[in-house]
Amino acid sequence: MRVGYDVGSLSTKLRLGTPQIPTVDGRVGAARMRYLMDRADDPVIPRRGFRVESNFHWFDASPGATSAFPVLDTRIEFFQPVSRAASFFLSSEGGSTFGSRNTGVPQFFLGGPGRLSAYGVNELFGNQYYLFRGGYLHELVSLPPFVGKKVYAVGSYEAGKVYGAVNESRFPNDFAAGVLAETALGPFFVGGSVGDSSHHKWFFQLGRVF
């Protein structure tokens, strides 16, 4: 568990397209409490174990907000091997501002790889959300030591919702599949996804996948 205070500044400005969130500029300040339990067998691509992470913020200053407000988000992940080369994974997460609406800018976003992959990055946004993800991981080959570790095939199903999001479908969900490599530069994932209401994407990602 960790307790502290975060301080910074936030400035939003439209450069192209139609404005979706307010234009704000100012100080951000929040007391923060973080809880983390990590019982996974690998920090990058786990095959066994579980993780629980929860963050609570009390924002006393945020550009555009009319008063102080709370934010809580929690994520739970579970990994279970079914053979030497294969494993399943499940994750669930959610967050809320507990009814606080005048937060200046939205506090939660969905869309992009691993967060409704068929949707555009941060396409859905609001102050309360949930996301479920379940999938299968299968080891394909091992890389030379100077290149990385292993390469996996990954398939997953994702479903989530952002309450109050503009133009959101009744049930945002998708299927995603691709190849994940644990390289010397970090995990690299390339794949595609097909979802509801004609959403579909090809994508690649360098960085944390789980």
Name the predicted role of every residue range.
Residues M1-G8, L36, E53-H57, S91-G95, ...:
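Transmembrane beta-strands of outer-membrane beta-barrel proteins
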Residues M1-R2, V44, S87-F89, P187-F189:
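Membrane-spanning beta-strand positions in outer-membrane beta-barrel proteins
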Residues M1-T23:
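Transmembrane beta-barrel wall of Gram-negative outer-membrane proteins
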Residues Q20-I21, V28-V151, Y163, V209:
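C-terminal outer-membrane beta-barrel translocator/porin domains of Gram-negative envelope proteins
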Residues R32-Y35, V179-T183, H199-F210:
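Outer-membrane beta-barrel "beta-signal"
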Residues Y163-F171:
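Small/polar, glycine/serine/threonine/aspartate-rich low-complexity segments that form flexible
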Residues S193-H199:
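A short, acidic, flexible beta-alpha connecting loop/helix-capping segment that sits on the rim
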